[in-house]
From Swiss-Prot:
Origin: domain of life: Eukaryota
Annotated InterPro entries: Kunitz_inhibitor_STI-like_sf (IPR011065), Prot_inh_Kunz-lg (IPR002160)
Organism: Neltuma juliflora
Signal peptide span: none
Stated family: Belongs to the protease inhibitor I3 (leguminous Kunitz-type inhibitor) family.
Keyword Disulfide bond: yes
Gene3D superfamilies assigned: 2.80.10.50
Protein name, per record: Kunitz-type trypsin inhibitor alpha chain
Taxonomic path: Eukaryota, Viridiplantae, Streptophyta, Embryophyta, Tracheophyta
Disulfide pairings: C40-C86
Entry's Gene Ontology molecular function annotations: serine-type endopeptidase inhibitor activity
A Pfam cross-reference name: Kunitz_legume
Keyword annotations of the record: Disulfide bond, Protease inhibitor, Serine protease inhibitor
Length: 137
């Protein structure tokens, strides 16, 4: 089974995509925001406006394959065209913070906790799932 983007194109390993909600009227795409005393926006959140596509995200699987399929272990990293001063020197790769269970942007010194994420079919759409190393896959 192949994963398709909103244009019906196959998801390419390393491709850049906007991650949008399945249903309109429920907010926009995913972006970064400051939470809990952060000096730079490091938390992945959904944009409030449904017209805001959020930030483009690169989605890739470590194996060198052309197409992303359901259940593949994936890394996700924001790739803004014009990164803010806060993000010019840091990775924008996603990780899950253990204490809060929030998706955060990892700083270069803290590579622990990157992914893996998976894309799974859900009804007529897809959902992103975080897979903790300790969980069954």
């Amino acid at each position: 089974q192949e994963l398709l983007d909103v244009d019906g194109e196959i998801l390419r390993n390393g491709g850049s995509y906007y991650i949008l909600p399945a249903f309109r009227g429920k907010g926009g795409g995913l972006e970064l925001a400051k939470t809990e005393g952060e000096t730079c926006p490091l938390t992945v959140v959904q944009a409030r406006s449904e017209t805001d596509r959020g930030l483009p995200a690169s989605i890739w699987s470590p194996p060198r394959i052309a197409i992303i399929r359901p259940g593949f272990s994936l890394n996700i990293e924001f790739r803004p065209r014009n990164p803010s001063a806060c993000h010019r020197e840091s990775s924008l790769q996603w990780k899950v913070e253990e204490e809060s269970q929030q998706v955060k942007i990892a700083v270069k010194e803290d590579a622990r906790g990157f992914g893996p994420f998976r894309i799974r079919p859900h009804r007529d759409d897809y959902k992103l799932v975080y897979c903790d190393e300790g969980q069954k896959r």
